[in-house]
UniProtKB/Swiss-Prot annotation:
The gene is abnB. CDD domains: GH43_AnAbnA-like. Its main location: secreted. One of its GO terms (biological process) is arabinan catabolic process. This is Probable arabinan endo-1,5-alpha-L-arabinosidase B. Gene3D superfamilies: Glycosyl hydrolase domain, family 43. Pathway: Glycan metabolism; L-arabinan degradation. GO terms for molecular function: arabinan endo-1,5-alpha-L-arabinosidase activity.
């Protein structure tokens, strides 16, 4: 089945330097980076090339409303940027929250990995609070009648793991409640996907308000992505909420989309950040974008070899190539022209272990079939 996917690429904040300074005027193209041998070379036609704009961002969520594009990303109180087109010019216009998250755990000032959806004349921004490397985490939600800054109400806790109410119930006893993603079908049923490392990616149904889990989570939860054999060693952290006794499984950042007649579950696999060019992970261990599909939003999702994503499957859609290193943190924006897969990546060469701004890129003319 042919799927039209335009690549809307966001160079991640994490660990990327030698990033050219881009003009913020109109849609002027960026300077080309220095030609440097890639640590994991790919054939030139292995993946579509990228195209940069002026947006500096990390972990984006993109929606399109009445001719304006809105981007939501990690940052103080969840940053909002707006633009008249995906090319830009992008302008930071404010934040979702007008104060720290009301959830009393994790990084309340700068919630992680937000995702914004529109349903029943309301905008919902789902976000996570946590501390890096630990699963004492929570997912919250804010709502507004408009997508821009101002007018948002923080409803607080939706689900949590590690500590707090409900964290002693399955699947929160073994999962990490970050990287929220919500899908609402044409029938109005909503589903929350979440998870990072530990027991992989899970899904629970939401009630009609999208503000609470529907039914009993123990019986309704579905494990969507997992691998039995952990590819990374176990942590020796003294806090049991910050170690994985059976080893680490680098699975996170899920996103569910629909392209008739299939539901596609996208996720990121591998090391996302804190790279050292003198000691890069083995080829294939850095971030890449993977996918599976199902005839049901509840799964099971399989790759084109028929492997269940809950048993180690996952079709690689985009990986390191050219000056792209460790792409991930993806989402899908459905436009009249087709489905736009957007994500962030590190621009190679990656040369130091600090966080810096990075840049939005877009390719709106790439058509490829990742399932054949």
């Amino acid at each position: 089945m042919t799927v039209l996917v335009a690549l809307f690429c966001l160079v991640t904040w994490t660990l990327c330097t030698r990033i050219p300074q881009y003009s913020t005027q109109g849609t002027q193209q960026p300077q080309q980076p220095e030609k440097t041998p890639h640590p994991h070379p790919q054939p030139e036609d292995a993946f579509p090339p990228t195209h940069a704009t002026d947006l500096k961002i990390h972990d984006p969520s993109i929606i399109h409303v009445d001719g304006t594009y809105y981007s939501y990303s990690v940052g103080r109180h969840i940053r909002i940027h707006q633009a008249p087109s995906l090319d830009g010019p992008w302008e930071r216009t404010g934040a979702v929250l007008n104060a720290d998250s009301v959830i009393p755990k994790g990084d309340r000032k700068a919630p992680w990995a937000p995702q914004t959806v529109h349903h029943n004349d309301t905008y919902y921004c789902f976000y996570a609070v946590s501390n890096s490397g630990c699963r004492d985490s929570a997912i919250g939600v804010a709502t507004s009648k408009s997508p821009g800054p101002g007018g948002w109400t923080d409803h607080g806790l939706l689900v949590q793991s590690g500590t707090g109410k409900g964290s002693d119930e399955h699947p929160f006893t073994s999962s990490n409640t970050i990287d929220p993603s919500v899908f609402v079908g044409e029938d109005g049923h909503g589903y929350l996907m979440f998870g990072s490392f530990w027991s992989g990616i899970w899904q629970v149904p939401l009630d009609e308000s999208l503000l609470s889990v529907a039914g009993d989570t123990s019986s309704e939860a579905r494990q969507l992505v997992y691998m039995e054999k952990a590819p990374l060693p176990a942590s020796k952290h003294p806090n049991p909420l910050c170690r994985e006794p059976s080893g680490a499984r680098p699975i996170e950042g899920s996103f569910l989309s629909y392209h008739e007649p299939w539901y596609y579950l996208w996720f990121s696999y591998g090391k996302c950040c804190k790279f050292d060019t003198k000691n890069l992970p083995p080829p294939g261990r850095e971030y890449s974008i993977r996918v599976g599909r199902s005839k049901s939003p509840r799964g099971p999702f399989v790759d084109k070899q028929g492997r269940d994503l809950a048993n180690g499957g996952g079709e690689i859609v985009y990986a390191s190539n050219r000056d792209v290193y460790a792409p991930g943190g993806q989402g899908v924006l459905t436009e009249k022209s087709g489905d736009i897969l957007y994500y962030h990546y590190c621009r190679y060469p990656v040369i130091q272990e600090i966080e810096v701004d990075a840049d939005l890129t877009v390719n709106k003319s790439t058509s490829y079939d990742f399932w054949v």
